[in-house]
Amino acid sequence: MQFLSISQRRKGFAEGDYARLAEQEMERARELYTEGFIRQIWHRLDMPGACLLWEAGGEEQVREMWATFPYAQAGMNEMLLVPLKPYAGFRPTKPPKTRT
């Protein structure tokens, strides 16, 4: 199952707080990507934060993995998690043509 997480920084933390944990945060993202849990990552342009496309068995698994990020462990980020389902408009509407 796929999920989209949308995170943003919490108020009350300085830029230096994020800078101190940035390398650890990126390393954890690389690990989860290599393990196949993270499919894609985007930085947000509207505010500091990120959007991640996850592949997991369920919402609880994503929340557990997200909680392993250094920013999450320090309470510096908050996250909205959206479960996704395939777009129905791409399914075939007619049976495939048979070759003769």
Positions of predicted regions on the chain:
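Conserved, structured core segments of small domains
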Residues: 1-100
